[in-house]
Amino acid sequence: MKSNRGSNSRFKLLAFIVAFAVSLLASMAAAGPASAGQSHHRTWQVQVGSESRDQAIQGMQFLPSEIFINEHDTITWEANSAEIHTVTFLASGQPLEEFNPFSDDELLKRGGDSYDGHSYYNSGLLANVDVPGFPDARSYSLAFPREGDFTYYCLVHGMVMKGTVHVREQGTDYPYSQADYDKSSRAEARSILRDGRELTRDLADQATSHMVIAGGDDGVAMVMRFIRPTVTVHVGEKVNFVNTGMGAPHTVTFGNEPANIFAPSGDPWHFSGGDLNSGIIPPQGTFEVTFKATGTFEYICALHDYMGMVGKVKVVD
């Protein structure tokens, strides 16, 4: 499933970064630099993710994604979406790998409250709602006692969701205030929502009665919905569930959720009702089901049903 959106996703990310920088420069020109003082240590706020009111669109950005602070300042990252994220500083030389939902080192907080500049620090999972089956927190704070430029990632979404903390010498004037960052972040969040709505329309053009789009993302926004959530097919016909995204996994789960939602279970080739689970459908992955009996069969994404990612297949003679 290739589209023009996939080919220009890097351009879109660059456009968001440029727009954010321009907005910050405009704020700085209007307000001037903020004085640091000599002994006062500040606490800064960064939003983790963003979302539409109905949670159908989820943002894949730290807002702001780049922040300038001074030695001994603290940053508090606030969960701003129902989708899970992490704030993770990798250890020196540690590669960024695929998210492992079975690793406590990725699910839970690791490291202390003051960053040493080279060890592994992790917020654990952050979300602004309770996420079924996962431990989660609402915020994460970390102090920065040393100068340097430090990159961090969301382990769940990988390279498409990263941020940078620039720590300067104590007493350096701040180029931007918290109000500057907040203003630019609000503008970027609105842009992410516009991108998500456009992505939803593009996915709707791809969906058919026999091909349901099981979510999608483009490196900027995620669509947490089945596109064509209700389809009608005949007995013996197939429905193909396609994850068109770049970074977000999904499931297609009929009946009761299994204890391990990440593993496939049931018989998708002869489905007449009952329990059936795709296991994880990775980005660009598919899951095909052949329906052998009439009826209305409801299903969910076991990872995102609490956001409203549900659907049904009506099977007729």
Positions of the model-derived regions?
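N-terminal secretory signal peptides that target proteins for export/translocation
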Residues: 1-12
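Generic low-polarity alpha-helical segments
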Residues: 1, 22-24, 212
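Bacterial N-terminal signal peptides
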Residues: 15-27
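Extracytoplasmic copper-binding redox domains, predominantly the cupredoxin/blue-copper superfamily
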Residues: 31-317
